[in-house]
Design a protein with these regions (language model features):
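Two-component/phosphorelay signaling modules centered on CheY-like receiver
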Residues: 11-30
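Acidic, metal-coordinating helix/loop segments flanking the phosphotransfer/catalytic sites
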Residues: 31-48
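Active-site residues of response regulator receiver
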Residues: 52
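Hydrophobic/aromatic residues positioned on beta-strands within the core alpha/beta folds
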Residues: 79-81
């Protein structure tokens, strides 16, 4: 079974590019445009989350804190991304594994995703 990646991003362009690239790489992808939309998908169990910080109905940092404090999701890697936030401030606000400043190099992002998904199995994917 392919790895599932959950993307919480309100910017359609960024969301579509990430989704297209990840699907091309063989991953399954679920996209969410708002915090509320994300929170209603409790049945989903992604292998990695990519979260934007600034969202129309909330804050990705708060979502990250929630994910990292839940026993069900605390071990799932999180990549935070933002065009505006200070990366050091983001690091102290939640326990995400990676922080990416927008705009970002899509291939560097893919490399981070592969590393996080395969950190326990370097020969996977």
């Amino acid at each position: 079974m392919n790895k599932l990646i959950g993307i919480l991003e309100d910017d359609e362009g960024i969301r579509d590019i990430l989704q297209f690239l990840l699907l091309e790489e063989g991953y399954e992808v679920e996209c969410y445009t708002t915090v509320n939309n994300f929170l209603t998908k409790k049945d989903s169990n992604p292998d990695l989350f990519i979260l934007d910080v600034m969202l129309p109905d909330g804050n990705g940092l708060e979502v990250c804190k929630m994910l990292k404090s839940s026993p069900k999701t605390s071990a799932i890697p999180v990549i935070m991304m933002s065009a505006h936030a200070d990366l050091q401030q983001m690091n102290s606000a939640c326990r995400a594994e990676e922080f990416v400043k927008k705009p970002f190099d899509i291939f560097a992002m893919l490399e981070k995703i592969v590393q996080l998904l395969n950190k326990d199995n370097p020969l996977a994917h």
